[in-house]
């Protein structure tokens, strides 16, 4: 039985690399939550560099991802805001040679700017060095045929009225997909009250 497999591994550098101008906002979205606060989430400096797969398999797609997610909260109690900032992808493929998708990733190298990571194993508010082993595994039954799968590659707990998370050269692969693969990056801000806002970028073609 073959599977559509998606895997992320992260390099040790935290230097953000992007061909676009620094702080160039790619997309953003705002929403007013139940407490009257305006929640805004942005993606900036997004770059997905598709490369020839090392396994030389025609069903494999490989890429490196750099970018930044930023959030802002305005309104009453903005400084007391608590929530989660997520980055991830919507993955689209015309055909899969199997019945499932498996996903795993290694905790990414990230730089927190103006935010705070409060949950273990982090406990820091500056630079995080990743674990050497995958931290999350996700499986889903897709069956044969076209499909779209949304996967949050990582998330951090944040506090305060604003903050940003940068990721450099996240390594991703998709195997078992016949035809091209489209990746639509997203950033999502989820308040502790349950309110959320998600911004989606333009699809990147990993042919």
UniProtKB/Swiss-Prot annotation:
Induction text: Not expressed in wild-type cells, it is induced in an mspA deletion mutant.
Keyword Amino-acid biosynthesis found: no
Record note on disruption phenotype: Single deletion is viable. A triple mspA-mspC-mspD deletion grows slower than the single mspA or double mspA-mspC deletions and has reduced Fe(3+) transport compared to wild-type.
InterPro entries the UniProt entry points to: Leukocidin/porin_MspA_sf (IPR036435), Porin_fam_mycobact-type (IPR015286)
Cleavable signal peptide: 1-24
Cell location: Cell outer membrane; Secreted, Cell wall
UniProt keyword list: Cell outer membrane, Cell wall, Ion transport, Membrane, Porin, Secreted, Signal, Transmembrane, Transmembrane beta strand, Transport
Cross-referenced Gene3D superfamilies: Porin MspA (Ig-like beta-sandwich domain) (2.60.40.1650), Porin MspA ribbon domain (2.10.300.10)
GO biological process: monoatomic ion transport
A GO CC term assigned to this protein in UniProt: pore complex
Family, per entry: Belongs to the mycobacterial porin (TC 1.B.24) family.
Subunit and interaction comment: Octamers. Probably forms a goblet with the wide end on the exterior of the outer membrane and a central channel. It is not known if mixed oligomers of MspD with other Msp subunits form in vivo.
Function according to Swiss-Prot or TrEMBL: A backup porin induced when MspA, the major porin, is deleted. It probably forms a water-filled channel which favors the permeation of cations. There are about 2400 porins in wild-type, 800 in an mspA deletion and 150 in a double mspA-mspC deletion.
Protein name: Porin MspD
């Amino acid at each position: 039985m073959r599977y559509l497999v998606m895997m992320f591994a992260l390099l040790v550098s935290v230097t953000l690399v992007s061909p676009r101008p620094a702080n160039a906002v790619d997309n953003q979205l705002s929403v007013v939550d139940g407490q009257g606060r305006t929640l805004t989430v942005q993606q900036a400096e997004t770059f997905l560099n598709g490369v020839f797969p090392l396994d030389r398999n025609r069903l494999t797609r490989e890429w490196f991802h750099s970018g930044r997610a930023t959030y802002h909260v305005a309104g009453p109690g903005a400084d007391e805001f608590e929530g989660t900032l997520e980055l991830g992808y919507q993955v689209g493929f015309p055909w899969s040679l199997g019945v499932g998708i498996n996903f795993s990733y290694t905790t990414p190298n990230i730089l927190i700017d103006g935010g705070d990571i409060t949950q273990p194993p982090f406990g820091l508010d500056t630079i995080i060095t990743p674990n050497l082993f995958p931290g999350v595994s996700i499986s889903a039954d897709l069956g044969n045929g076209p499909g779209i799968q949304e996967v949050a590659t990582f998330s951090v707990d944040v506090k305060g009225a604003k903050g940003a998370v940068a990721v450099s050269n996240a390594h991703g692969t998709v195997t078992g997909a016949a035809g091209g693969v489209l990746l639509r990056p997203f950033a999502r801000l989820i308040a502790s009250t349950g309110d959320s806002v998600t911004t989606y970028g333009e699809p990147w073609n990993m042919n």
